[in-house]
């Protein structure tokens, strides 16, 4: 299993890494959130660009990215436009989405981008290659806010991400029952033990799935999302509580 190193952070060894999401709508909001996050205990800062009002203006996006980078200087920055169809705030055409991610890569301000698996294989492959040429890592993602697919389907999607060149495959699914949480955990173990040659991130959302956000080290998920202020997805818990639990499980 190879690890992924971003700045000085090694993902895929030790306790799962904590990712927090910044979701400001304006550049003023983005700056104030980044300042508020500066003292929080996390490993990776995700900028959820789909919350940013001026997302279709590249200059505004890059100005905001620069502002974040000036305030949070030492942590890896993950650039994420979550599409409306996968639970995000706005919709872009495929062309706009790819152009936005390429602009982020070109900027030199971000360390990682999030690419949704179902954007289209050709577009995804080309954008992964482009990111890698610029030393930007790729988290490839899929989100189902309605249900939990069968374990075989979860594994298949994660394997597809790996085949398309993702540095870190990621999937988040919604449980309707407690058994659905076990389905996600079973799929995580199977992927991690049988197929993965790189770190993966998995989670079962909502309060029902919260155990999956805590027990990643046990089952094979290399990172988890926590909340500094407002949760970016259902079931997230505070970073302070998250770090405590992750450390307990790591040292057990």
From Swiss-Prot:
Catalytic residues (UniProt): 143 (proton donor/acceptor), 170 (schiff-base intermediate with substrate)
GO MF, any single term: 3-dehydroquinate dehydratase activity
Record annotation: effect of changing residue 86 to Q: Strong reduction of the catalytic efficiency and slight increase of the affinity for 3-dehydroquinate
Regulation: Inhibited by (2R)-2-methyl-3-dehydroquinic acid.
Keyword set, alphabetical order: Amino-acid biosynthesis, Aromatic amino acid biosynthesis, Lyase, Schiff base
InterPro entries the UniProt entry points to: 3-dehydroquinate_DH_AS, Aldolase_TIM, DHquinase_I, Type-I_3-dehydroquinase
Result for mutant: residue 236 to A: Nearly abolishes enzyme activity
Catalytic activity: 3-dehydroquinate = 3-dehydroshikimate + H2O
Signal peptide feature range: none
Effect ascribed to mutating residue 170 to M: Abolishes enzyme activity and 1.5-fold reduction of the affinity for 3-dehydroquinate
E.C. no: 4.2.1.10
CDD domains named in the record: DHQase_I
Positions of 3-dehydroquinate binding: 21, 46-48, 82, 213, 232, 236
Enzyme class: lyase
Family: Belongs to the type-I 3-dehydroquinase family.
Protein name: 3-dehydroquinate dehydratase
Originating organism: Salmonella typhimurium (strain LT2 / SGSC1412 / ATCC 700720)
Gene this protein is translated from: aroD
């Amino acid at each position: 299993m190879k690890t992924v190193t971003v700045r000085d952070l090694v993902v895929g060894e030790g306790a799962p890494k904590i990712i927090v999401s910044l979701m400001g709508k304006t550049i003023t909001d983005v700056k104030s959130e980044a300042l508020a996050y500066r003292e929080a205990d996390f490993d990776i800062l995700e900028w959820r660009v789909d919350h940013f009002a001026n997302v279709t203006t590249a200059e505004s996006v890059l100005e905001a990215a620069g502002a974040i980078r000036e305030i949070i200087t030492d942590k890896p920055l993950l650039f994420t436009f979550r599409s409306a169809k996968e639970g995000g705030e706005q919709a872009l055409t495929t062309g706009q989405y790819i152009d936005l991610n390429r602009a982020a890569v070109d900027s030199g301000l971000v360390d990682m981008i999030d690419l949704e698996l179902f954007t289209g294989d050709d577009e995804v492959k080309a954008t992964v290659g482009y990111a890698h040429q610029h030393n930007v890592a790729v988290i490839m993602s899929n989100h189902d806010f309605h249900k939990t697919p069968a374990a075989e389907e979860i594994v298949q999607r994660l394997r597809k991400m790996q085949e398309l060149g993702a540095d870190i495959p990621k999937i988040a699914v919604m449980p309707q029952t407690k058994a659905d949480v076990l389905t996600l955990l079973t799929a995580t173990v199977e992927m991690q033990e049988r197929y993965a040659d790189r770190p993966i991130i998995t989670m079962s959302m909502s309060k029902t799935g919260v155990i999956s956000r805590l027990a990643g080290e046990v089952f094979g998920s290399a990172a988890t999302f926590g909340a500094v202020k407002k949760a970016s997805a259902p079931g997230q818990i505070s970073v302070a509580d998250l770090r405590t639990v992750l450390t307990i499980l790591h040292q057990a």
